[in-house]
Amino acid sequence: MFPMVTEFMNYGQQTVRAARYIGQGFMITLSHANRLPVTIQYPYEKLITSERFRGRIHFEFDKCIACEVCVRVCPIDLPVVDWKLETDIRKKRLLNYSIDFGICIFCGNCVEYCPTNCLSMTEEYELSTYDRHELNYNQIALGRLPMSILDDYTIRTILNLPERKT
């Protein structure tokens, strides 16, 4: 008779322990219920990028002196700089400048080491296309400034999500 009583007591203790574990899990679930969602509805909502975000490169043709520092510091020798030496003034004249964003790793070395600051990083990150050849930007495409998501009234911007207090 005693083994049956002890088994019944063990069964009761296990039931109480299981109920406690289920209750703890349920309390964790309830604590997450009052938080705001982490995900955003992407095409209609966009996060504002940080100041140091490395997006598409903007190029100012008039400032470039064709020194090719950007090509030398690029880990994959990506920027294509075509220039011609003007013999009468003994200066380089820039003919063409292009970057293929299908290959670019967005390291920012070209922007950092440019002596004339003709390169800068923008907040644009939507570079997807159906044809990879469209990602090869020449100096005209690189010179276009991206449309700011702050100016687009169809997109709801999310600046900072409220932080969770622990």
Curated annotation (Swiss-Prot):
Reactions this protein catalyses: a plastoquinone + NADH + (n+1) H(+)(in) = a plastoquinol + NAD(+) + n H(+)(out); a plastoquinone + NADPH + (n+1) H(+)(in) = a plastoquinol + NADP(+) + n H(+)(out)
Any Gene Ontology biological process: photosynthesis, light reaction
Binding-site positions, [4Fe-4S] cluster 2: 74, 104, 107, 110
GO cellular component, one term: chloroplast thylakoid membrane
Cofactor binding annotation: Binds 2 [4Fe-4S] clusters per subunit.
Membrane disposition: Peripheral membrane protein
Cell location: Plastid, Chloroplast thylakoid membrane
Pfam family, one: Fer4
InterPro entries given in the database record: 4Fe4S_Fe-S-bd (IPR017896), 4Fe4S_Fe_S_CS (IPR017900), NADH_quinone_OxRdtase_chainI (IPR010226), NDHI (IPR004497)
Family statement drawn from the similarity comment of this UniProt entry: Belongs to the complex I 23 kDa subunit family.
NCBIfam families linked: ndhI, NuoI, PRK05888.1-3
PANTHER family documented for this protein: NAD(P)H-QUINONE OXIDOREDUCTASE SUBUNIT I, CHLOROPLASTIC
Self-association state and partner proteins as the record states: NDH is composed of at least 16 different subunits, 5 of which are encoded in the nucleus.
Protein name: NAD(P)H-quinone oxidoreductase subunit I, chloroplastic
Source organism of the structure: Chaetymenia peduncularis (Daisy)
Name of the gene: ndhI
